[in-house]
Amino acid sequence: MAARIFLLYLFLLCCACHVQAQQDTDTARHATGVKKTLRNIYIEGNKRTRRNIILREMSVSEGDKLPVAKMDELAELNRKRIFNLPLFTEVVIDILPVDDTTVDWLVKVGEQWFIIPELTLKLADRNINTWVKEQNADIRRANLGVAFKHRNFRGNLETLSAIVQIGYTQKLGLEYFKPYIDKKQQHGIGASFFFSQNEETFFNTSGNKWQFVKKPGLYIIRHFEAATKYVHRPGYANRHTVEARYRSFRADDTIVKLNRDYYKDGSNRLQIMEFTYRYDLNKVDNWNYPTTGLKVVGTAGFRVGLQGFGFQSYVNGEVGYFKRFGRKWLWSEILRGRLTAPDDMPYTFRYAMGNGSEYVRGYEYYVIDGTQYALLRTNLKYELVNTAIRNFPIRYLAVIPIRIYPKIFADVGYAVNPLAGTSFLNNRGLAGYGFGVDIVSAYDFKLRLEYTWNHLGQKGLFLHTNSE
């Protein structure tokens, strides 16, 4: 097990080194030819965002000598870099000639609405299809929340958010993150606190379906966590995150009687400290919806029990490769995997595919627990629409981008579970394929409509609002 974890992590690091070497080669290539001096970088439209936050994202600085042959390409590269900040609805860079040897750049930005009070209605189930088919669209399984989020607190890209949620899951939360605490803008810190409780929860998996238990008027599961993190961002695309998290769980005796391994050995209380290190290499063109580039994410962590738990280590990995063919065709491969040790762990940590964004498309109705899993997604897309509605009569939504991508896709996956029981989709290969359409718009909005077949001969139309 340790060897597999080491090899996976070594693979991710090798990918990162390869991309960094390629970046150095590209930089050297740009250094040839006739050059002009970048005299000034002017910025317009940043009524809230500080100038240094924008300059931090750029690959050029005032005084740099830029190759004339690459000037437009560099301007577009930096426009995309600035747009990847979750702050702007539009970014434009104009090149202003000064004389034969000098140019200025004018960066024009349209700021988003940073203070976002949200009234949210979220489903407690894993996806909309599960809620409709298995829970008969029971509105009692919805969560009504009021969230206050400031995405550019004090103009420094700081985030401050608070949430109060009622309904199926009652939740209170507070989170703060300051991306830069130093003059070089490389080091950041953050902290968060969350509490939740439910009258109903799943206590086991049988036949790759969650089994639920409920006690009306009694909260049978409670969860509290507090976390702090440190982030080091030495360059534009590289990010290192170290996090320490305290987590406390309490379950009603009813859950323990139904599943003694829920927290392990019949315990109804679980307290742990969790420590993680995460490395991100993000060399894609658009962080919200990539179409070209490479993305590598590696996470290594361990959990130490303070009560009702021993020790668990894990490694998660993701490699995404995105390629554009011609002007309209897009191809992507996304590989994800997870390894944990030991195999004998509480049920609540024995998750693999079927929750969140980790699933083989076509198996959205199933939960596939496991201690290890691998998932590969392949997509071929066509850029049918790439336009924007301009001069919209709302200040913070003056430009509404609209992109539509018809696609075909195929997924394969495998989850290892030594305690599979009656679940029949574990410890075997899974495959799904289909066609669909992605719709992307402002404020990181994404909508995926997918019609999928799986190896069981089942088919259906699925709706998702998260990324692939």
Identify the role of each PLM range.
Residues 34-192, 266-290, 372, 415-420, ...:
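Outer-membrane beta-barrel initiation region
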Residues 88, 112-114, 153-155, 181-184, ...:
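Outer-membrane beta-barrel channels and translocator barrels
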Residues 120-124, 147-151, 163-167, 177-179, ...:
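Outer-membrane beta-barrel pore domains and translocons
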Residues 140-144, 168-172, 220-226, 269-275, ...:
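Residues that define the transmembrane beta-barrel architecture of outer-membrane proteins
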Residues 186-330, 411, 415-418, 426:
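Transmembrane beta-strand segments of outer-membrane beta-barrel domains in Gram-negative
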Residues 193-234, 337-371, 458-463:
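Outer-membrane beta-barrel translocator/channel fold
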Residues 272-399:
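C-terminal outer-membrane beta-barrel translocator/porin domains of Gram-negative envelope proteins
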Residues 276, 380, 439, 458-468:
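Outer-membrane beta-barrel "beta-signal"
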